Regions:
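Nucleotide donor/acceptor-binding cores
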Residues: 1, 83, 123
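NAD(P)+-binding Rossmann beta1-loop-alpha1 motif at the extreme N-terminus of oxidoreductases
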Residues: 1-48
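Hydrophobic Val/Ile/Leu positions in short beta-strands of Rossmann-like dinucleotide-binding domains
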Residues: 3-6, 64, 127
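A general structural signal for well-ordered alpha-helical segments in protein cores
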Residues: 12, 37, 71, 135-138
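Short phosphate-binding/catalytic loops that engage adenosine nucleotides
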Residues: 24-25, 83, 102, 147
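Rossmann-like NAD(P)(H) cofactor-binding subdomain of soluble oxidoreductases
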Residues: 34, 44, 48-118
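Short, charged/polar "capping" segments at the starts of alpha-helices
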Residues: 35-39, 93-95, 132-136
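Internal alpha-helical scaffold of NAD(P)-dependent oxidoreductase catalytic cores
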Residues: 43, 119-154
Length: 154
């Protein structure tokens, strides 16, 4: 799958490494700080982008790995037609993404992640999509990253 990452902090960095290890492709990285986006993009051979308008339509999944507080504001700026839009927060409802994409959900890592990790331990995920189709794709994607995947419900 082709993935866009929004964010460049701990969660985004570890997810980027996991995504590449699972033989998916991180195609773009966006961050409020372009230097941070460039640094993460370089690690995974992705393209850093300066604005959300530059996001490619070729990606399958767009992951918002930003602070919980930033999710609602960032979601308001996104209008994705076909992509699955995910956030990584356990305390934020998936429905905050409702107006940003018809296909949305949560990919929540049940473990603290640090970008400095040299070895990434097995990370359990809770997932929750807004439809059966999204849940099926999200489950396949999450299982490519981890053996420990469970469904959650808002």
């Amino acid at each position: 799958m082709k993935v866009i990452l929004l964010g460049s902090g701990n969660t985004a960095t570890v997810l980027a490494k996991m995504i590449v290890k699972a033989e998916h492709e991180v195609v773009q990285v966006w961050s409020r700080n372009f230097d941070h986006a460039k640094a993460l993009a370089a690690k995974v051979h992705a393209k850093p982008v300066t604005t959300l308008d530059e996001l490619t339509s070729e990606a399958d999944i767009c992951i918002m790995a930003v602070s919980d507080a930033a999710i609602p504001q960032l979601a308001k700026q996104l209008h994705l037609r076909r992509k699955i839009l995910l956030h990584t927060a356990g305390s934020v409802s998936k429905d905050v993404l409702r107006n940003s994409s018809p296909n949305y959900g949560v990919l929540y890592p049940l473990q603290s992640l640090r970008k400095e990790m040299m070895v990434i331990p097995p990370v359990p995920f809770l997932i929750d999509g807004n439809s059966d189709e999204v849940n099926a794709l999200l489950e396949d994607f999450a299982h490519s990253l981890s053996d420990n995947v469970e469904f959650a419900d808002d």
